[in-house]
A protein has these predicted regions:
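Active-site beta-alpha loop architecture of Rossmann-like, nucleotide-cofactor-dependent enzymes
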Residues: 13, 105, 147
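C-terminal segment of N-terminal export signals and the immediately downstream linker at the start
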Residues: 1, 22-54, 272-273
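Short Asp/Glu-rich motifs
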Residues: 15, 26, 111, 188-189, ...
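Serine-esterase "nucleophile elbow" of acetyl-processing enzymes
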Residues: 37-105, 110-112, 128-136, 258
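N-terminal secretory signal peptides and thylakoid transit peptides that target proteins
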Residues: 1-17
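Ser/Thr-centric signal marking residues that sit
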Residues: 10, 67-68, 181
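Acidic/histidine-rich helix-loop elements
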Residues: 72-77, 102-123, 150, 193, ...
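Alpha-helical cap/lid subdomain in secreted, periplasmic
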Residues: 87, 91-95, 119-296
């Protein structure tokens, strides 16, 4: 697939801003040319994101493959995108979040994946009870699909296994659940036997993950759009995001969370409530007939 076709076929992915698929109304970015439509725009039609959590987070578990676990393509473990995310969360919460990284390199979603025989075990479906439910997180990130896509696992099997994990984790501890789309890569033929993937198959997997987010009311963090098809964000190995790519991925997940979890702003609002600036601006707004209203 050439670059022009790549961009044309991924336009819907690149337009996403990380909102869960359950939010179906148009976003601000989808409203088109503001000046052309301002005369007929109804503010009531503006999509408002669902608020999944009004309190700060206490414990994060991320379940994933090598990009989650990290490896020699990064000089330091804290360059992993999950670590980037944790630093962003800690920067806005009063108390740091407990961070449990359950990434395993060369991991598969389940024994049904064609990649399973040569993979590092146990697979996600063989370990989520212990690695996720056993820790009872209030924030859960499920980041799978890359290796199974590269092995050409049937989409129906992948979807069923993902659904089992999501359903069981929600039933057991009901965390805010984030699904990430499959990452961009460049070496689709370089690593036998998981060398059956392609951009086309990645797009199908990502549509599957979006549908799971919609069905199970999860937040979608669009890792694919974060990387945007930029080859320079991928390591020499052609598979893993490099340091800069991981910065983008971590920020994309944080963006999705911040847009859907008002609890991440709780500490800020408490700190600023009695500041001179807040007193001044809220007074001026009240005088103008436009008082501050907490809508969340």
């Amino acid at each position: 697939m050439n670059r022009r076709s790549f961009l044309r076929n991924t336009s819907s992915s690149l337009a996403g801003i990380g909102a869960g698929a359950a939010v179906t109304s148009p976003s601000i970015g989808a409203l088109g040319n503001a000046s052309a439509h301002a005369d007929r725009f109804d503010p009531r039609a503006l999509a408002k994101p669902k608020d999944y959590r009004k309190e700060p987070f206490g414990r994060l578990v991320i379940l994933g493959e090598s990009t989650v676990e990290g490896g020699p393509w990064l000089r330091e473990k804290d360059q992993r995108y999950a670590d980037v995310l944790v630093r962003l969360i800690d920067a806005v919460q009063e108390k740091p979040i407990e961070y449990i990284n359950k990434g395993i390199g060369n991991n598969s979603i389940s024994p049904r994946s064609p990649a399973y025989a040569q993979s590092v075990k146990p697979s996600a479906i063989e370990r989520y009870q212990k690695d996720v439910i056993g820790h009872r997180p209030d924030l859960f990130i499920l980041a799978y699909g890359l290796n199974d896509m590269r092995a050409a696992m049937p989409l129906a099997d992948f979807r069923e296994d993902m659904a089992t994990i999501i359903r069981d984790v929600k039933k057991a501890c009901d965390p805010v659940t984030v699904l990430t789309t499959v990452y961009y890569m460049t070496a689709y033929r370089g690593w036998s036997p998981i060398n059956q993937g392609s951009i086309e198959l990645t797009l199908k997997y990502n549509d599957c993950i979006r549908s799971l987010a919609a069905e199970f009311d999860c937040i979608l963090a669009d890792a694919w759009s974060a990387e945007g098809g930029a080859d320079w964000l991928i390591d020499y190995d052609g598979v893993h995001a490099n340091k800069v790519g991981n910065l983008l991925l971590g920020n994309k997940v944080f963006e999705a969370l911040a847009q859907h979890c008002s609890g991440l702003t709780q500490y800020f609002f408490a700190q600023e409530k009695d500041s001179e600036w807040t007193k001044y601006t809220t007074r001026k707004r009240l005088e103008a007939g436009d008082p501050f209203k907490r809508t969340w």
